[in-house]
Amino acid sequence: MGKVRIGFTFMLAFSLAATAMAADDLEKLRDRQDRAALESHATALHGAAEKTPNDANGWYRAAVAYSYAAEVAMEVKDKNGAQKNAEAGAADAEKAIALNSKAADYYRVLGTLCGEVIPANPIAGILSYGKRAKEALDKAIEMDPKSAKAFLAHGVGYYYLPTNFGGGPDNAIKDFRRAIALEPRSADAWLWLGIALKKQHQNAQARAALAKSLQFDPERLWTRDQLDKTPPQ
């Protein structure tokens, strides 16, 4: 019995390590905006998940890849592509949660994907995905209140959600600062803090935040683009 437990623990640790390595690879593709490679990875991971449909982590990995693909599509201003990838990923994240409702990051990824539909298709996105995004991200924070990524995703959701729906940059900035407090070297949190500050016309502070983001992730093309587009004052 002890050997079985040790074997299971080893396999679980190996699976988590493989997932972390895959996520790092996807982040590198995201940083250089290699959308074709991200979409290829997402399609391949979705296909692999279909072959092992009872593996929640397989669906989760596919959802993560779709999220990065949607993110880059939005960065290069392809709203249709962003919506397509986000909706495909949300469906995979739902399957992961149906198999394992105990993983906080599954909810974080679902909320992120639902939130990514909103800037791609604001009216339909808010009506069809706004509530789902908020509920999933609230759940992720409830389950793991020390997750910087969950607060970051929650803040991005607020950033894209209109103020009359409870969103806006003020609420987003609070979440981004919480994420930074939990993970001071989070390049993504500093990036989004800079974007939100720029929206509030706090350009000097925005540039400082964007520069901080580049300090932690100098390869991120979109961060450099945002910094270049932000005036000094």
Each predicted region: which residue ranges?
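Terminal, low-structured helical/coil segments at or just beyond the last alpha-helical repeat
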Residues: D170, D188-I195, K199-Q233
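Helix-start (N-cap) detector for alpha-helical repeat units in TPR-like alpha-solenoids
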Residues: A56, A104-D105, A148-K149, A187-D188, ...
